[in-house]
From Swiss-Prot:
Site (Transition state stabilizer): N103
Biological classification of the source: Bacteria, Pseudomonadati, Pseudomonadota, Gammaproteobacteria, Enterobacterales
Organism: Wigglesworthia glossinidia brevipalpis
NCBIfam families, per database record: PRK08125.1, PRK11908.1
Active site (catalytic residues): H105 (proton donor), E433 (proton acceptor), R618 (proton donor)
Catalytic activity: UDP-alpha-D-glucuronate + NAD(+) = UDP-beta-L-threo-pentopyranos-4-ulose + CO2 + NADH; UDP-4-amino-4-deoxy-beta-L-arabinose + (6R)-10-formyltetrahydrofolate = UDP-4-deoxy-4-formamido-beta-L-arabinose + (6S)-5,6,7,8-tetrahydrofolate + H(+)
Molecular-function GO term, any one: UDP-4-amino-4-deoxy-L-arabinose formyltransferase activity
Protein's UniProt name: Bifunctional polymyxin resistance protein ArnA
InterPro entries: Arna-like_SDR_e, Bifun_polymyxin_resist_ArnA, Epimerase_deHydtase, Formyl_trans_C, Formyl_transf_N, Formyl_transf_N_sf, Formyl_transferase-like_C_sf, GART_AS
Known partners and oligomeric status: Homohexamer, formed by a dimer of trimers.
Binding site for (6R)-10-formyltetrahydrofolate: T137, K138, K139, I140, D141
Name of the gene encoding the protein in the UniProt record: arnA
Gene3D superfamilies, A to Z: 3.40.50.12230, NAD(P)-binding Rossmann-like Domain
Pathway named in the protein's UniProt entry: Nucleotide-sugar biosynthesis; UDP-4-deoxy-4-formamido-beta-L-arabinose biosynthesis; UDP-4-deoxy-4-formamido-beta-L-arabinose from UDP-alpha-D-glucuronate: step 1/3; Nucleotide-sugar biosynthesis; UDP-4-deoxy-4-formamido-beta-L-arabinose biosynthesis; UDP-4-deoxy-4-formamido-beta-L-arabinose from UDP-alpha-D-glucuronate: step 3/3; Bacterial outer membrane biogenesis; lipopolysaccharide biosynthesis
Family: In the N-terminal section; belongs to the Fmt family. UDP-L-Ara4N formyltransferase subfamily. In the C-terminal section; belongs to the NAD(P)-dependent epimerase/dehydratase family. UDP-glucuronic acid decarboxylase subfamily.
Amino acid sequence: MKVIVFAYHEIGYIGLSCLIKLGFKVLSVITHIDDHASEKIFFSSVKKKSLKHKIPVFYPKNINNLKWIDYLSKLKPDIIFSFYYRKILSEDILKIPKLGSFNLHGSLLPKYRGCSPLNWVLINGEKTTGVTLHRMTKKIDHGSILSQYSIKIEEKDTSKSLYKKLCYASMYILNKTLPMILKNKINEIDCTDDFSSYFHKRYPKDGLIDWNQSANNIYNLIRALTKPWPGAFSYLFDKKIIIWKSKISFESYKTPGTILNFNPLIISCKKKSLEILSAQYTECNILNKRNIENISRIKGKKLIIKNIKSFKNLKKILILGVNGFIGYHITNLLLKYNNYKIYGIDIKNNLVKSFIGNEKFCFIKGDIKQYYNWVKKKIKKCDIILPLIAIARPMQYIKNPLKVFKIDFEENLKIIRYCVKYKKRIIFPSTSEVYGMCKDDYFDEENSNLVTGAIKNQRWIYSSSKQLLDRIIWAYGVKNNLNFTIFRPFNWIGPGLDDFKIAEKQNARVTTQIIFNLINGLPVTIVNNGNQKRCFTDIDDGIEALFEIIKNKNNKCNKKIINIGNPHNEYTIMQLTKIIINIIYSNNRNYNFPKFSGFNMLSGTNYYGEGYQDIDRRKPNIDIAKKLLNWTPKTKIRITLRKIINFFINNNTS
């Protein structure tokens, strides 16, 4: 059987070796250059193995161009195999072989699709992982499964020890499955999306330790990134300290990052503490506690291990409404990077409590009307202004329209004018509601009409306030050269959207309200038969897009309006409700929820009050987001709903 092999790293070497041993005819090998300058080479060379067996071997920069597609096509392979090759193969390449293309992935698919599953499973504290041989399709790691092998993750496993286990598992699965493929006996099962997850590529900078995490979380990060990977790190006296090995200690809690003891070296975390067993400070290896005292000359001093060198070069971001749904999630992401200093204000702090004490987070609890001098100074000081203060619950549009106008329009207009005055970049959260009753199949930022209802229908106060602010920002951009990006979220949902205190008053947004009623044995209220269609977007997908707007690579987002939504997650409210019911009661044996109490069917007027008008559907065109942000939403509705339900179960039930 004739095959082409894409391979790299130790598992790539194992895959190629197994094919040669079993008698496959390897026509060509595509690999990467063994670059000692850019990474530590601790694995066997696929290139050398190929040359030893006189197999043509190449390492192209762009395997998907026409030259290489033509070369591979002329070889006429029966199968393409990919073993830890680092580039995505185009559909044109995948369809070349007669029997298909197969990939060996380092996780138990559909869990941990994407990059760096070895590191991610350790970071997330998983107990099992494995390897999967699967068919390659246009969608990454979605093809049908030929074979899987499960591996137990021990508490003391590190990236190195787990990688060895993955190598043995790869050898086992290939020796078991390849002979069947050689006989053209390929048995496959579907790779469903149930319990699927996707993780992005990790970079050395992602190893920055956040001491506001628990000791357990930091321990997992350290063992996931230890040698031969670049390591988890922090800063001591403005010099990097890389921590290679640790164990959890039970010292009393102090400010996270405080060195509690030198012999042994113990550093406090948000919960418990870490004893450092091995570390590297500048060019010196720290293998004992006396060594660190001599290196840093800090014996007897109280000091903090810092997350960053200095704040001078950090991009400063002011987030108004930082404790809200979007504010919390974007802050959580930004603080994981070494590039941002966050200034935030909100009337509550329940979500951002865990950030307080972080040197990169400055928080004021209060109303912006009472702290306007502070807000004004921070607008003048910061690089980016993100005004997230708004009332965004439909019940309030009807009951308190003037309050909605006061907060959503008047307060935000002041912020916009300060941004004009001080020449600051503003990233403004518009809303999908500005499209109103638009009849387009897909709502387009540049061409769709914005259609609202009669004046007596007060539910449009929110949409109209946001639309007018969009127009004002645009005008300031034209006349005063205001640097802005407007983003329009389409039904972002996830943990923390609303809390149960709001749901107790039957005043929460639809997802939270449905879950609350079901968990508490209350009838689920369905408005206008639940035929309204919405496109639901996972908060992590939305935040990923917002993060790209903040980074603004090559200034692509300047003076742009960008829809951020998931057009593939379109469901009626009734369909959404039935999915939630299915998820909740499939877990009922674990939580003993009350029996389903049925539906309470109401008209919009009876539920919200006079002045309500429904919107049948809103579906985004996300071509601009794809182009400018290189972003597409990935998360399916069931995965998002499971996260929300688990969040509420863990935080609101005994």
